[in-house]
């Protein structure tokens, strides 16, 4: 009996809206006592933190398999099983009886939408929230309409998705309003986002107010370079800028859907962090662009570079403008 009790379950999930909402859906459908493994949005090498043993289980959500492949192999070698759901380029996925992978890299899906399909829409409102957070606005609105949500309900899901996503950005957990594990635990008690907002309005208000303030600061900045097809913005090394770097890129894309956008944030060490958004009218190329740089990764429509050395800034801007010329 003690052996069964000691078998641990690990839930490793991206700290953004997609990762959090994917796990909420799964744990509402299949509650488990688990060890939560998460961090800021760009902290995706989460499997390296898991020291599993035979018979244990890992759920991995919204973290690129390619970036975690060595640790996935180590976990499988230990005799543990992995349930993997993601929408980033996975690289090579090994054949293994203990690995169940649901990976779809289509630009109009996200991890929470994949989970939604696996659960036959059981917790649809959380999936819609995540899709809005990932800036899949048309997909989210269509799904909300199919599900019978009112315009007011849909607007609430959109605002919440954007705010949860906003909370995940930062160079460290100190930049965030809520640790992603804490935010997950606050929301996981509720079948729907509507119930969550009704019960804990102060959490939503904290994020919404922070988002509005930070976005106002970002909106005051002019692009450092701008063409018909691409615009580059530079944000300072300040907490508000680190928090807003990704959602600001989404906002720019929504306002100018035919243009690509790069949001470059200065780091304390002199390097840069980069967020790239492909044009919404042609969601492609962002992943190929950032992979030209050592710490780049992401999806066709949205990608980033964790550390861009100062001496590569001009090369990045040239490559960015060439990609979207």
Task: For each feature predicted by the language model, list its residue ranges.
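Short N-terminal helix-initiation segments at or just after the protein's N-terminus
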Residues: 2-3, 168-180, 199-212, 243-250
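Oxyanion-binding "anion nests"
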Residues: 102-106, 186-233
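Alpha-helical structural elements
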Residues: 8, 161-164, 199, 206
């Amino acid at each position: 009996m003690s052996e069964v009790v000691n078998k641990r379950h690990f839930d490793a999930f991206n700290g953004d809206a997609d990762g959090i909402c994917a796990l909420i859906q799964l744990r509402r459908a299949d509650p488990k006592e688990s060890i939560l493994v998460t961090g800021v949005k760009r902290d995706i090498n989460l499997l390296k933190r898991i020291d599993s043993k035979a018979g244990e289980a890992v759920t991995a959500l919204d973290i690129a398999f390619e970036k975690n492949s060595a640790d996935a192999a180590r976990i499988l070698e230990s005799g543990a099983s992995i349930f993997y759901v993601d929408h980033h380029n996975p690289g090579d996925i090994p054949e293994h009886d203990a690995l169940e992978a649901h990976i779809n890299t289509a630009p109009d899906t996200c991890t929470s939408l994949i989970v939604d399909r696996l659960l036959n829409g059981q917790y649809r409102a959380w999936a819609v929230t995540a899709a809005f957070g990932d800036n899949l606005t048309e997909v989210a609105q269509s799904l909300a309409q199919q599900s019978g949500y009112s315009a007011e309900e849909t607007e609430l899901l959109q605002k919440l998705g954007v705010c949860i996503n906003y909370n995940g950005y930062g160079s460290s957990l100190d930049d965030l309003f809520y640790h992603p594990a804490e935010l997950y635990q606050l929301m996981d008690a509720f079948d729907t986002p509507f119930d969550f907002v009704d019960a804990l309005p102060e959490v939503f208000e904290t994020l919404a107010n922070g988002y509005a303030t930070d976005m106002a600061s970002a909106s005051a900045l002019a692009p450092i370079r701008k063409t018909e097809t691409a615009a580059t913005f530079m944000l300072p090394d300040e907490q508000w800028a680190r928090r807003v770097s990704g959602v600001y890129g989404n906002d720019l894309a929504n306002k100018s859907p035919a243009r690509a956008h790069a949001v470059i944030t200065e780091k304390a060490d002199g390097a840069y962090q980069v967020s790239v958004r492909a044009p919404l009218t042609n969601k492609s190329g962002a992943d190929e662009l950032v992979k030209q740089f050592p710490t780049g990764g992401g999806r066709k429509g949205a990608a980033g570079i964790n550390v861009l050395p100062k001496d590569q800034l001009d090369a990045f801007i040239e490559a960015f403008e060439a990609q979207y010329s």
